[in-house]
Amino acid sequence: MKENVFNKEAFIEDVKENVKNLYRKTLDEASQQEIFQAVSYTVKDVIIDDWLATQKAFDKQDPKMVYYMSMEFLMGRALGNNMINLKMYKEVKEALEEIGLNLDEIEDQEPDPALGNGGLGRLAACFMESLATLGYAAYGCGIRYRYGMFKQKIKDGFQVEVPDNWLKNGYPFELRRPEYSYEVKFGGYVRAEVTEEGKTRFIQENYQSVLAVPYDMPIVGYGNHVVDTLMIWDAEPMECFELDSFDKGDYHKAVEQENLARNLVEVLYPNDNHIAGKELRLKQQYFFVSA
């Protein structure tokens, strides 16, 4: 694949342009979080060139594709890791220093993607990066948790668990792919119907459904311009809001579909020491394998 040549002046201009387009600010006015977003989008532009080239190469070669399915991927922060794998970390650091920016402070603005918890998630992440570094055609498949597990705080000498809202500022290293969305159905019943050709067809009725919407995250191989894909699925309501129910005063039913979708992807491994938790885990796993 074509070798990327780092252009310091162009990189700095792209960062400034991203700050302007994303936040309607100059670089001097931007916060550290906003600068992190702008730098990340600039790096992602470099990644996307390799991502497209990788896809074209795989389409031409038609290799066997590896699909790594896991309920969790503990990926870690992406900005620094991606720059290292692109072999541009030193150049970016020096370019940012020229305009008075500290790369270490910028990297500290990135939240850990709350897509995993422990050994299983870290193993999945390592496998995906190894596959990309070795040049294998691979997809990771998981769930886009909104809060993952939790953040730990110490209050009055005791651990307190609070939600880890890693998506509150948006995440620059993901691409929403609504064109690949699928309907996932829950509940109801199945009836059999015989067609005119004499074939039996099974039809699911009186079900609840959500829309499984994929987000692509790049998995950058080290120094080889190969970019594989981690596809994580979010759950969205088929109909966000039932105005008729709302007008009748049934406010709970008005947002029932939205609540069903949100519950599926709120947290990794929801508490299952009660019936509702067991049902949610089963629905979560069914949603994943269906998508």
Task: Describe each PLM feature range.
Residues 1-291:
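A conserved ligand/cofactor-binding region detector
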